[in-house]
Amino acid sequence: MHLMEFPREVILGKNLIQEINNVIKRLKLGSPGLVVYGPITKKIAGSNVEKIVKEEFEVYSITVKEAHINEVERVISKIRDKGIKWAIAVGGGSIIDVTKLASFKMGIPFISFPTTASHDGIASANASIKGLNVKTSIKAKPPIAVIADIDVIKTAPKRYLAAGVGDIVSNITAVRDWKLAHKLKGEYFSEYAASLSLMSAKMVIRDAEIIRLGQDEGIRKVVKALISSGVAMSIAGSSRPASGAEHLFSHALDMLLDKPALHGEQTGIGTIIMAYLHGINWKKIRDTLKIVGAPTTAYELGIDPEIIIEALTIAHTIRPERYTILGKEGITREAAEKAAKITGVI
């Protein structure tokens, strides 16, 4: 059996905080609800969301500091104690991922209200949570609705939108890896999911100059592409259409660094290197990232070149069952250094 789950509603536009109660009514979610935000996203939109929802529904709130299993447990306790029927995540990747996993474990729906367009977790079923004995993302359920308010997303530093582009272009190498696993390992491959994923990447490459401006049109394009990536993963029933060796590289960096860069910044650089290994046009990917203002070198990422090389050599161990261009044995230090140098990453 192949189960596909998607958001029931995706709303993209301006001044959407006013629309939240209509979404809750249309989806018949009832009361009480839970607003989940971070210390910063509370100020950006969380308090406003809470105030609007309170006008028509009973609602509680909780502040989440990081994407850690302890925070997930705190949210679960709140859901249990207050008999919460649904949750709304107001924030970036961490807040959305914590809410996603907590609501999944408690069997309640959640609404995704992103404050940044920095990665494809805003509409996907996957959550990246620290403190578990898994090194990568875990599968939960996608949001029942996504409400992407351009006015809110626009207030985030441009760095976040550029990181979103980094996460989307990584679909190019992810699909290559997936095809490779299909050919060499007989892994299930969905032409439809792969096409949707690649289309998202092609669109942001084509519209990089518009995205660079950080205005409404560019934000709209990135958000649409991120949501399409999430839907592609739902169709595939796995993160395969949007996560390959470049994501393993990013997870390796997360393990090696005390303070990693943004997820999309790391996957963007990973994509340049993996595209080189695949023998495809890595310069086009690098140029796109440069146009939107995303980092393309270790120096711009603020990461020691030595760490880049190490991450490349250990990336294959992160998810041994996920076959990629790195192969089962990984790549040698020499090959890693050569790839990083040729692509100008180090």
UniProtKB/Swiss-Prot annotation:
GO BP annotations, alphabetical order: glycerophospholipid metabolic process; phospholipid biosynthetic process
Q: Which cofactor does it need?
A: Zn(2+)
Cellular component GO terms, alphabetical? cytoplasm
Residues the record lists as binding substrate: D120, D167, H251
Query: Where is this protein found?
Result: Cytoplasm
Catalyzed reactions per annotation: sn-glycerol 1-phosphate + NAD(+) = dihydroxyacetone phosphate + NADH + H(+); sn-glycerol 1-phosphate + NADP(+) = dihydroxyacetone phosphate + NADPH + H(+)
Report the InterPro entries cross-referenced here.
G1P_dehydrogenase_arc, G1PDH, Glycerol_DH
E.C. code? 1.1.1.261
Note on how the cofactor is bound? Binds 1 zinc ion per subunit.
Uppermost EC category: oxidoreductase
> Can the keyword Oxidoreductase be found in this entry's annotation?
yes
Q: Which residues bind Zn(2+)?
A: D167, H247, H263
Q: Which keywords appear in this protein's UniProt record, sorted alphabetically?
A: Cytoplasm, Lipid biosynthesis, Lipid metabolism, Metal-binding, NAD, NADP, Oxidoreductase, Phospholipid biosynthesis, Phospholipid metabolism, Zinc
Domain of life where this protein originates? Archaea
What Gene Ontology molecular function terms does this protein carry?
glycerol-1-phosphate dehydrogenase (NAD+) activity; glycerol-1-phosphate dehydrogenase (NADP+) activity; metal ion binding
- Where NAD(+) binds, per the record, is at G93, S94, I95, I96, D97, T115, T116, A117, S118, S124
* Pathway annotation from the record: Membrane lipid metabolism; glycerophospholipid metabolism
Q: Pfam families of this UniProt entry? A: Fe-ADH_2 (PF13685)
Q: Which PANTHER family match?
A: GLYCEROL DEHYDROGENASE, GLYCEROL DEHYDROGENASE 1
Regarding protein family, the annotation reads: Belongs to the glycerol-1-phosphate dehydrogenase family.
Protein name, entry field: Glycerol-1-phosphate dehydrogenase [NAD(P)+]
**Biological source species:** Pyrococcus horikoshii (strain ATCC 700860 / DSM 12428 / JCM 9974 / NBRC 100139 / OT-3)
The gene is egsA
